[in-house]
Swiss-Prot record:
Keyword list, A-Z: Flavoprotein, FMN, Oxidoreductase, Pyridoxine biosynthesis
Matching Gene3D superfamilies: Electron Transport, Fmn-binding Protein, Chain A
Gene from which the chain derives: pdxH
SUPFAM superfamilies per record: FMN-binding split barrel
Phylogenetic classification of the source organism: Bacteria, Pseudomonadati, Pseudomonadota, Alphaproteobacteria, Hyphomicrobiales
EC code: 1.4.3.5
List of residues binding FMN: R53, M54, V55, L56, L57, K58, Y68, T69, K75, Q97, Q132, S133, W177, R187
Protein name: Pyridoxine/pyridoxamine 5'-phosphate oxidase
Reaction(s) catalysed (UniProt annotation): pyridoxamine 5'-phosphate + O2 + H2O = pyridoxal 5'-phosphate + H2O2 + NH4(+); pyridoxine 5'-phosphate + O2 = pyridoxal 5'-phosphate + H2O2
Domain of life of the native organism: Bacteria
Function: Catalyzes the oxidation of either pyridoxine 5'-phosphate (PNP) or pyridoxamine 5'-phosphate (PMP) into pyridoxal 5'-phosphate (PLP).
Species this chain originates from: Bartonella henselae (strain ATCC 49882 / DSM 28221 / CCUG 30454 / Houston 1)
Disulfide bonds, paired cysteine numbers: none
Protein family per UniProt: Belongs to the pyridoxamine 5'-phosphate oxidase family.
Protein backbone atom coordinates (compact mmCIF):
# COMPACT_ATOMS: atom_id res chain seq x y z
CA UNK A 1 0.00 0.00 0.00
CA UNK A 2 3.00 2.26 0.22
CA UNK A 3 2.20 3.18 3.81
CA UNK A 4 4.86 4.02 6.36
CA UNK A 5 4.18 2.50 9.76
CA UNK A 6 5.41 4.63 12.63
CA UNK A 7 7.71 3.00 15.13
CA UNK A 8 7.44 2.91 18.90
CA UNK A 9 9.85 5.83 19.10
CA UNK A 10 7.49 7.97 17.06
CA UNK A 11 3.84 8.22 18.08
CA UNK A 12 4.21 6.07 21.21
CA UNK A 13 6.28 8.85 22.75
CA UNK A 14 3.73 11.59 22.07
CA UNK A 15 2.39 13.39 25.13
CA UNK A 16 -0.52 15.38 23.66
CA UNK A 17 -3.45 13.47 22.13
CA UNK A 18 -4.87 16.31 20.06
CA UNK A 19 -1.48 17.08 18.52
CA UNK A 20 -1.10 13.42 17.61
CA UNK A 21 -4.62 13.27 16.16
CA UNK A 22 -3.95 16.38 14.07
CA UNK A 23 -0.78 14.79 12.69
CA UNK A 24 -2.49 11.53 11.81
CA UNK A 25 -5.47 13.26 10.21
CA UNK A 26 -3.15 15.42 8.11
CA UNK A 27 -1.31 12.31 6.90
CA UNK A 28 -4.60 10.53 6.19
CA UNK A 29 -5.71 13.49 4.09
CA UNK A 30 -2.83 12.69 1.74
CA UNK A 31 -3.10 8.90 1.72
CA UNK A 32 -6.81 8.04 1.97
CA UNK A 33 -8.74 7.52 -1.26
CA UNK A 34 -11.69 9.58 0.00
CA UNK A 35 -13.17 11.09 3.15
CA UNK A 36 -10.22 10.94 5.56
CA UNK A 37 -12.53 12.73 8.02
CA UNK A 38 -15.07 9.87 7.98
CA UNK A 39 -15.71 8.37 11.39
CA UNK A 40 -17.95 5.69 12.83
CA UNK A 41 -20.35 7.16 15.39
CA UNK A 42 -21.75 4.75 17.98
CA UNK A 43 -24.78 5.49 20.15
CA UNK A 44 -27.24 3.41 22.19
CA UNK A 45 -31.01 3.36 21.78
CA UNK A 46 -33.61 3.30 24.55
CA UNK A 47 -33.58 -0.53 24.67
CA UNK A 48 -29.82 -0.68 25.12
CA UNK A 49 -29.02 -1.77 21.57
CA UNK A 50 -26.02 -0.03 20.01
CA UNK A 51 -26.27 1.74 16.66
CA UNK A 52 -23.32 2.74 14.52
CA UNK A 53 -23.08 4.76 11.32
CA UNK A 54 -20.52 6.78 9.38
CA UNK A 55 -20.52 10.57 9.70
CA UNK A 56 -18.02 13.27 8.78
CA UNK A 57 -15.85 15.17 11.21
CA UNK A 58 -16.24 18.86 10.46
CA UNK A 59 -14.03 20.43 13.12
CA UNK A 60 -11.86 19.45 16.05
CA UNK A 61 -9.89 21.19 18.77
CA UNK A 62 -8.92 20.46 22.37
CA UNK A 63 -12.60 21.19 23.11
CA UNK A 64 -13.75 18.16 21.10
CA UNK A 65 -14.78 16.61 17.79
CA UNK A 66 -17.65 18.24 15.89
CA UNK A 67 -20.17 16.81 13.43
CA UNK A 68 -23.57 17.98 12.19
CA UNK A 69 -26.85 16.15 11.82
CA UNK A 70 -30.62 16.22 12.05
CA UNK A 71 -31.51 16.28 15.75
CA UNK A 72 -34.75 14.43 14.97
CA UNK A 73 -32.89 11.48 13.43
CA UNK A 74 -32.27 8.31 15.49
CA UNK A 75 -28.67 9.30 16.19
CA UNK A 76 -29.76 12.77 17.18
CA UNK A 77 -32.42 11.45 19.54
CA UNK A 78 -30.11 8.83 21.04
CA UNK A 79 -27.42 11.41 21.71
CA UNK A 80 -29.88 13.89 23.19
CA UNK A 81 -31.08 11.20 25.60
CA UNK A 82 -27.67 10.06 26.87
CA UNK A 83 -25.30 12.88 25.82
CA UNK A 84 -22.62 10.21 25.33
CA UNK A 85 -21.04 8.76 22.19
CA UNK A 86 -18.07 6.89 20.79
CA UNK A 87 -16.14 7.54 17.58
CA UNK A 88 -13.74 5.48 15.50
CA UNK A 89 -11.46 6.68 12.72
CA UNK A 90 -9.94 3.91 10.59
CA UNK A 91 -7.38 4.89 7.98
CA UNK A 92 -6.77 1.74 5.99
CA UNK A 93 -4.05 3.31 3.86
CA UNK A 94 -2.00 4.06 6.98
CA UNK A 95 -3.10 1.02 8.98
CA UNK A 96 -4.09 3.26 11.85
CA UNK A 97 -7.13 3.65 14.04
CA UNK A 98 -8.28 6.15 16.65
CA UNK A 99 -11.02 5.34 19.18
CA UNK A 100 -12.73 8.10 21.15
CA UNK A 101 -15.27 7.95 23.98
CA UNK A 102 -16.78 11.04 25.49
CA UNK A 103 -19.49 13.35 26.69
CA UNK A 104 -21.52 15.20 24.07
CA UNK A 105 -22.65 18.81 24.00
CA UNK A 106 -24.58 20.80 21.42
CA UNK A 107 -22.64 23.30 19.35
CA UNK A 108 -23.80 26.90 19.66
CA UNK A 109 -26.46 28.23 17.27
CA UNK A 110 -23.81 30.57 15.88
CA UNK A 111 -21.51 27.64 15.07
CA UNK A 112 -24.36 25.72 13.46
CA UNK A 113 -25.48 28.72 11.40
CA UNK A 114 -21.95 29.40 10.15
CA UNK A 115 -21.38 25.81 9.08
CA UNK A 116 -24.83 25.46 7.52
CA UNK A 117 -24.27 28.53 5.35
CA UNK A 118 -20.91 27.12 4.21
CA UNK A 119 -22.60 24.04 2.72
CA UNK A 120 -23.52 23.79 -0.98
CA UNK A 121 -26.92 25.28 -1.71
CA UNK A 122 -28.38 21.92 -2.74
CA UNK A 123 -27.23 20.39 0.55
CA UNK A 124 -29.02 23.14 2.46
CA UNK A 125 -32.18 22.47 0.45
CA UNK A 126 -31.78 18.78 1.21
CA UNK A 127 -31.69 19.47 4.94
CA UNK A 128 -35.20 20.93 4.65
CA UNK A 129 -36.54 18.32 2.23
CA UNK A 130 -35.33 15.16 3.95
CA UNK A 131 -37.16 13.80 7.00
CA UNK A 132 -34.05 11.85 7.91
CA UNK A 133 -34.55 8.12 8.61
CA UNK A 134 -38.36 8.34 8.41
CA UNK A 135 -40.17 5.98 5.98
CA UNK A 136 -40.09 7.18 2.36
CA UNK A 137 -42.89 6.11 0.02
CA UNK A 138 -40.85 6.71 -3.14
CA UNK A 139 -37.96 8.72 -4.51
CA UNK A 140 -40.52 10.88 -6.28
CA UNK A 141 -41.89 12.09 -2.94
CA UNK A 142 -38.40 13.25 -1.94
CA UNK A 143 -37.87 14.94 -5.30
CA UNK A 144 -41.15 16.83 -4.92
CA UNK A 145 -40.04 18.06 -1.50
CA UNK A 146 -36.73 19.20 -2.96
CA UNK A 147 -38.57 21.07 -5.72
CA UNK A 148 -40.90 22.70 -3.18
CA UNK A 149 -38.07 23.99 -1.00
CA UNK A 150 -36.02 25.02 -4.03
CA UNK A 151 -38.92 27.27 -5.03
CA UNK A 152 -39.45 28.54 -1.49
CA UNK A 153 -35.79 29.53 -1.12
CA UNK A 154 -35.13 30.56 -4.71
CA UNK A 155 -33.73 33.93 -3.63
CA UNK A 156 -31.46 34.86 -0.74
CA UNK A 157 -29.99 32.79 2.05
CA UNK A 158 -31.50 29.49 3.06
CA UNK A 159 -32.10 29.50 6.83
CA UNK A 160 -30.93 26.61 8.95
CA UNK A 161 -33.77 24.25 9.92
CA UNK A 162 -34.48 24.37 13.66
CA UNK A 163 -33.89 20.61 13.94
CA UNK A 164 -30.52 20.69 12.16
CA UNK A 165 -27.40 21.44 14.18
CA UNK A 166 -24.19 19.95 15.50
CA UNK A 167 -22.72 17.98 18.35
CA UNK A 168 -19.31 18.19 19.96
CA UNK A 169 -17.88 14.99 21.45
CA UNK A 170 -15.69 16.00 24.38
CA UNK A 171 -13.40 13.01 24.91
CA UNK A 172 -12.70 11.23 28.15
CA UNK A 173 -10.50 8.70 26.36
CA UNK A 174 -8.58 8.64 23.08
CA UNK A 175 -6.79 5.50 21.96
CA UNK A 176 -4.30 5.44 19.09
CA UNK A 177 -3.67 2.11 17.34
CA UNK A 178 -1.04 1.33 14.72
CA UNK A 179 -0.67 -1.94 12.85
CA UNK A 180 2.47 -3.98 13.48
CA UNK A 181 3.58 -7.38 12.14
CA UNK A 182 2.11 -10.57 13.63
CA UNK A 183 -0.71 -8.57 15.30
CA UNK A 184 1.72 -7.15 17.86
CA UNK A 185 0.19 -3.74 17.37
CA UNK A 186 1.11 -0.48 19.07
CA UNK A 187 -1.61 1.01 21.28
CA UNK A 188 -1.45 4.27 23.19
CA UNK A 189 -4.32 5.31 25.46
CA UNK A 190 -4.98 8.80 26.84
CA UNK A 191 -7.61 9.19 29.57
CA UNK A 192 -8.88 11.90 31.89
CA UNK A 193 -11.43 11.84 34.70
CA UNK A 194 -13.40 14.87 33.51
CA UNK A 195 -13.81 16.82 30.29
CA UNK A 196 -12.86 19.88 32.34
CA UNK A 197 -9.37 18.50 32.96
CA UNK A 198 -6.60 19.60 30.60
CA UNK A 199 -4.09 17.01 31.80
CA UNK A 200 -4.23 13.49 30.38
CA UNK A 201 -3.08 10.17 31.79
CA UNK A 202 -1.02 8.27 29.24
CA UNK A 203 -0.73 4.48 29.07
CA UNK A 204 0.68 1.98 26.58
CA UNK A 205 -1.48 -1.12 26.11
CA UNK A 206 -0.81 -4.70 25.13
CA UNK A 207 -1.96 -5.47 21.57
Amino acid sequence: MGNTVQTDNDFMQMQKPFALFAKWLEEATVSEINDPNAMALATVDKTGFPNVRMVLLKDFSPQGFVFYTNYESPKGQEILKSMKASLVFHWKSLRRQVRIRGIVEKVTPQEADAYFQSRPRDSRIGAWASKQSQPLESRFVLEKAIARYTTRYAVGNIPRPPYWSGFRVKPLSIEFWCDRPFRLHDRLLFTRDSVEHVDWKRQKLYP
